């Protein structure tokens, strides 16, 4: 069945009429940061956000453990994949230190704009809780796809957004100067 959510898998596994095969995906779910906005234009703030997030906990909370942490737009099994998860590892103390170095007074208030998909809404809850531990108050803004496409993607009206990329890894997509990040 297409579009089976991770939380639906157990009902299929428990039914002898179905054989469940779980495999990898080329989808990449990312937390996009609008680096055109202050204070997100400071790389220390972006690194602090990355260090505040436990990717494994997000996968567990939003995907019931189905998924693998990544540190870039490459997924395990993709041509040229290099594990970069250690570049910005989960480290709460480092996150707090980077925020202080950037001169950020906490609480730092940001908006996390979420499309209507379960991975985004559930992942958003986990990320909001993790960011709070370092003094970042992320308010979720749940939007429908049309709003996300025009406001977030089109007009770059967001601080943070959680989105899955499923398009082919095509340099033409990622080299667009006005791509939403």
Where are these regions (language model features)?
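A mature extracytoplasmic/lumenal domain signature
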Residues: 24, 35-37, 114-116, 142-144
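Extracellular/periplasmic solute-recognition and catalytic clefts
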Residues: 1-37, 60, 160, 164
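Beta->alpha turn/N-cap motifs
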Residues: 2-8, 55, 74, 144, ...
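Acidic-aromatic pocket-rim loops
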Residues: 72-73, 147-181
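Short helix-initiation/N-cap motifs at beta->coil->alpha
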Residues: 4-7, 116-118, 140-150
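Short Pro/Gly-enriched coil loops immediately N-terminal to beta-strands
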Residues: 22-28, 74-75, 180-181
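Append "and occasionally in soluble cytosolic enzymes with long acidic Gly/Pro-rich linkers
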Residues: 14, 21, 40-132
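Short phosphate-binding/catalytic loops that engage adenosine nucleotides
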Residues: 136
